[in-house]
């Protein structure tokens, strides 16, 4: 069912289609960059954590292709996914007199990918960029699909654009240097795909969680590829999130509220999504959409994955609602939640009674 060979997936968006290449050791091979960068001016943007690990490898590849390569290192952390850091990127590009033919590479996790993608969308009204995600979360989710953004103090990802990369290059060897907490945060998004789209994949994850945590190369390549396949299918159908793409936000309405209330960076995005997914599943159970056994399966796999599965002690129902009503899925003042309707399917539900949401939040303080 799964092998360690390199995987290649295409995101089909007509003339804006692009490849996702997945495998171990891709940083050793310039072929994946050559058609997009050979002889070009290239700016690699990364953070101070990733730069010592991988920047020299990427710069060496680019130089072997005859590129004029520059490096910009930014601070590391969700709190730096901001307009201030965006301005820092703009200043670097302007002061370097880079023209519209520059190629920008996002080398890092979700923060770098979102920030650099938004910068590429805005610089001179749009320049080419390549995603080279180095965390599991960014490899399976944020690097694919063209969502780019920075945060505002009042809400996550509120300032952004849909802007597709020219290519996504995923070297699974990056995961060997990833702290386990960051790896677990990525697993939250992996599990999400099984819950909303693929019951067979959910079962596979339940059976192979230990293999993933031991960084089994075959298991990782298969899991990442399956997530990217699902994301590519969804994005091809609904690039701008007017329909099915909203399902990818399972757990995110609750999760974004946690991140915004407790301060960006205190909870990792995937951690907040995990707790939010449990709250969404409990809401679905209270609404009669899933049964106890299905809820238990969702709770169990997230718990086994060493992720937070309870409501943060310090957050009240009102804290949640303040942030959730700013969610981008709110339409005409009505909160819309992504809820599982079984393991393998989900739907967007409007007008869930606030009493049900309150009970779900409270239940998830102590549920086990």
From Swiss-Prot:
GO terms for cellular component: cytoplasm. It is found in: Cytoplasm. Binds 1 divalent metal cation per subunit. Can use either Co(2+) or Zn(2+). It catalyses: 7-phospho-2-dehydro-3-deoxy-D-arabino-heptonate = 3-dehydroquinate + phosphate. It comes from the Bacteria. CDD domains: DHQS (cd08195). Keywords: Amino-acid biosynthesis, Aromatic amino acid biosynthesis, Cobalt, Cytoplasm, Lyase, Metal-binding, NAD, Nucleotide-binding, Zinc. NAD(+) binds at residues 76-81, 110-114, 134-135, 147, 156, 174-177. Its main location: cytoplasm. Its cofactor is NAD(+); Co(2+); Zn(2+). Its EC number is 4.2.3.4. GO terms for molecular function: 3-dehydroquinate synthase activity; metal ion binding; nucleotide binding. Pathway: Metabolic intermediate biosynthesis; chorismate biosynthesis; chorismate from D-erythrose 4-phosphate and phosphoenolpyruvate: step 2/7. Zn(2+) binds at residues 189, 252, 269. InterPro entries: Dehydroquinate_synthase, DHQ_synth_AroB, DHQ_synth_fam, DHQS/DOIS_N, DHQS_C. It holds the Pfam family DHQS_C. Catalyzes the conversion of 3-deoxy-D-arabino-heptulosonate 7-phosphate (DAHP) to dehydroquinate (DHQ). NCBIfam families: aroB. Belongs to the sugar phosphate cyclases superfamily. Dehydroquinate synthase family. This is 3-dehydroquinate synthase. It comes from Vibrio vulnificus (strain YJ016).
């Amino acid at each position: 069912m799964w092998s360690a060979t390199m995987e290649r997936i295409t995101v089909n968006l007509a003339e804006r289609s692009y490849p996702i290449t997945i495998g171990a050791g891709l940083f050793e091979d310039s072929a994946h960059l050559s058609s997009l960068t050979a002889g070009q001016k290239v700016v690699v943007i990364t953070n101070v954590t990733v730069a010592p690990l991988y920047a020299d490898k990427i710069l060496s590849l680019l130089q072997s292709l005859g590129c004029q390569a520059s490096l910009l290192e930014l601070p590391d952390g969700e709190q730096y996914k901001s307009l201030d850091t965006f301005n820092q990127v703009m200043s670097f590009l302007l002061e370097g007199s880079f023209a519209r033919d520059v190629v920008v590479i996002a080398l890092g996790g979700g923060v770098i990918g979102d920030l650099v993608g938004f910068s590429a969308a805005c610089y001179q009204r749009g320049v080419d960029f390549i995603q080279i995600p180095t965390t599991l979360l960014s490899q399976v989710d944020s690097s694919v699909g063209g969502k780019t953004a920075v945060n505002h103090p009042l809400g996550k990802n509120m300032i952004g654009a849909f802007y597709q990369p020219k290519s996504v290059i995923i070297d699974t060897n990056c995961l060997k240097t990833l702290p386990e907490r960051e790896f677990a945060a990525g697993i939250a998004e992996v599990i999400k795909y099984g819950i909303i789209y693929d019951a067979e994949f959910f079962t596979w994850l339940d059976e192979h969680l230990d293999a993933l945590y031991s960084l089994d190369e075959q298991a990782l390549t298969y899991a990442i590829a399956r997530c990217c396949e699902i994301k590519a299918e969804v994005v091809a159908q609904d690039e701008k999130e007017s329909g099915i793409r909203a399902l990818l936000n399972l757990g995110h309405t609750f999760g974004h509220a946690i991140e915004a209330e407790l301060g960006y960076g205190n909870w990792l995005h995937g951690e907040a999504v995990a707790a939010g997914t449990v709250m969404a599943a409990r809401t679905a159970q209270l609404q009669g959409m899933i049964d106890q056994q299905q809820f238990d399966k969702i709770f169990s796999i997230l718990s086994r994955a060493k992720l937070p599965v309870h409501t943060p002690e310090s957050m009240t129902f009102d804290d949640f609602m303040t942030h959730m009503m700013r969610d981008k899925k709110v339409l005409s003042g009505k909160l819309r939640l992504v809820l599982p309707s079984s393991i393998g399917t989900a739907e967007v539900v409007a007008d869930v009674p606030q009493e049900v949401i309150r009970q779900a939040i409270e239940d998830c303080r102590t549920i086990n």
